């Protein structure tokens, strides 16, 4: 028997290699079997690939004429386990092979890596190039040990590409025709052991060519989809990067623009500050302009306007009486006074404020209530009363001519307060005719109708008095004036003696008609024939009579 009869030693593997005796090349089967293990958990796909690369370089150095890997697959390796299997089976080796040179034996660790490389076959398959992946059924997807058996492994029922000793023994025994050994090894190889997870096996024995073609198409479609996904991620990343760069450029431009505007603002402020002292067009006192009666006027002229308001309003009847400091008596170009340098045209007139003040009696004023807003008050507004001359020197004047005006523009809807005694009480006072007094009262009333200084004086705070106004009941109202000659007033009302110290202050009529009884009121009001026909606004009120001061 020669070596040519063994298919395992054909020139596919031992091409251009001198033959040598097998006992000198390989160790015993027991030694190799004791070292090799089927499971090598310490090997990783990276170390396995490094071992394969080292073996490939060694083979390429010894075979310079063959293009290693030119057919799309790595050069198969001759491992010691196949040689040991032949020796263990007792196959005779001719003596003519002893003169062959000996190749150095492989390291056991390398043999372990090659033997167990199928345990990581799923990882190695993913690392192959695209030509090998698209051709699933090519010989590039078969492992090294299966290819070492050559056509013998293809002749087995389901070799499955499992790299173990049972497949090698089954291949050798099937080649030699040993039926018993071949059948037992074939039974053990029917159930290939899957050592670890990963992808499905590259080649399935029960798969039809149509299914293999479908698998190839499906894998190609999956690869294209994965490539599209990667491209989409790359494009999205590039778009985001470009957007970030654009935003950064925009931010830089905005910062530069802000700096330029700030510099321009500083320059303008500097120029303005340098020009203001030398500017003759705008005066500093004309910058603050206030309004008066809807007209623009400088603030410095309000004092002059307030001093001459009485005289101006006396000559200009279209002025507003309810505002103090009214500037009137000007020309129609008052709106331009804030921009002109000419003084205002104020007409001098006699100041009649001193003449009016001597006829006006000061009364307390509630500062929380405006005297002009009489509609917001419940009671009569606090008005100014004119001190009349003695009643003995006053003529019999009608009530409507002696009403004290509260201002031309006050708009009060409340009952006017008369300044004289009611007509019903007229017989109690000796009245004489004096034309001079009538003229004096009428002139004072006319001046008060046009003068705005009454409201101006109402806003001036005054001292609060310590006495209350009390009016003693007088007149022919069925009062018994038996003790009229005695000081202190009447002591009887309709024959009933008054024994209380108040003397008519808290009587029934005053409690019912004059208020709560706690405020000073006048005597009981008894209507007569003359006052019954008067207008309700002209009826006498408890505060209508001339008041007297009574110490509490």
Curated annotation (Swiss-Prot):
Compositional bias segments (type: Low complexity): 135-145, 304-325
Pfam families: bZIP_1
Region (Basic motif): 214-233
Compartments, as annotated in UniProt: Nucleus
Region entry Leucine-zipper, spans: 240-247
Quaternary data: Homodimer. Heterodimer with Jra. The kay-Jra heterodimer binds more stably to the AP-1 site than either of the two proteins alone.
Free-text function comment from the UniProt entry: Developmentally regulated transcription factor AP-1 binds and recognizes the enhancer DNA sequence: 5'-TGA[CG]TCA-3'. May play a role in the function or determination of a particular subset of cells in the developing embryo. It is able to carry out its function either independently of or in conjunction with Jra.
Protein name in UniProt: Transcription factor kayak
Organism: Drosophila yakuba
Lineage, highest ranks first: Eukaryota, Metazoa, Ecdysozoa, Arthropoda, Hexapoda
Gene: kay
